[in-house]
Amino acid sequence: MERKSYVFGNWKMHKTAKEAKDFLSIFCPFVKEISPASLVGIAPAFTTLSACCESIKEMDSSIWLGAQNVHQDSSGAFTGEVSLPMLQEFHVNFVLLGHSECRHIFHEEDATIALKVGAAARSGVVPVLCIGETLEARENGTTKEVLSNQLMLGLAQLPETAPVIIAYEPVWAIGTGKVASTADVQEVHAFCREVLSRIFSKEKSEIISILYGGSVKADNAEGFARCPDVDGLLVGGASLDPQGFANVLRNFNL
């Protein structure tokens, strides 16, 4: 089975419902025009999921709708949290889990992330497990150890046959303008695939898509597309502008 290609936009805490609808009114036609090989998705804020779901349906778009996080329980006394059944009301296809901002700002731990990965997979929502090393780990030469641990612990609750997507985002490259070289990214992605083969099997590791994120822009997207183990992109700031995101998508699919 051939690995699928994905280009996802993570909007973080940006865009009101109106702004999201305005974005999609411009971006969806771009996607139809480009007709990319990659599956395209956006992960907006929870408060705009309804508007995005409505717009995607109205425009008969193939764009996937994602969420930026989720609680592992289906309901309960968890103030401020959102459950998988709530996301499924808006036909959410994927959910980002373990993003570095959740790990480092909100102190999410691997064990909790693993529960979320398992819950999402069992609910039919594709978990996108985000992994990445800090600048300190990179400078100390412990990148592979950090990533290996994040993969093994984060995937501990994933059902054996469930789909999963991995997103490698070096923390030192997120929103900093610093971009890892294509050679470095390819080396890390190949290593991650090797770890996945140990966790699951060689066969399963070959069908798991691994995305790259970290200051991805239109002018570097084509370079990442040439890396054999880079199966897509997780785009931050560059996904907030419809033309800019379309350019990333176009260049990655040249």
Curated annotation (Swiss-Prot):
GO terms for cellular component: cytosol. It catalyses: D-glyceraldehyde 3-phosphate = dihydroxyacetone phosphate. Keywords: Cytoplasm, Gluconeogenesis, Glycolysis, Isomerase. It is found in: Cytoplasm. Pathway: Carbohydrate biosynthesis; gluconeogenesis; Carbohydrate degradation; glycolysis; D-glyceraldehyde 3-phosphate from glycerone phosphate: step 1/1. The active site is at H99, E169. It comes from the Bacteria. The keyword Isomerase applies. Its EC number is 5.3.1.1. Pfam families: TIM (PF00121). GO terms for biological process: gluconeogenesis; glyceraldehyde-3-phosphate biosynthetic process; glycerol catabolic process; glycolytic process. The keyword Iron-sulfur does not apply. GO terms for molecular function: triose-phosphate isomerase activity. Substrate binds at N10, W11, K12, G175, S215, G236, G237. Signal peptide: none annotated. Belongs to the triosephosphate isomerase family. Involved in the gluconeogenesis. Catalyzes stereospecifically the conversion of dihydroxyacetone phosphate (DHAP) to D-glyceraldehyde-3-phosphate (G3P). Homodimer. This is Triosephosphate isomerase. It comes from Chlamydia caviae (strain ATCC VR-813 / DSM 19441 / 03DC25 / GPIC). The gene is tpiA.
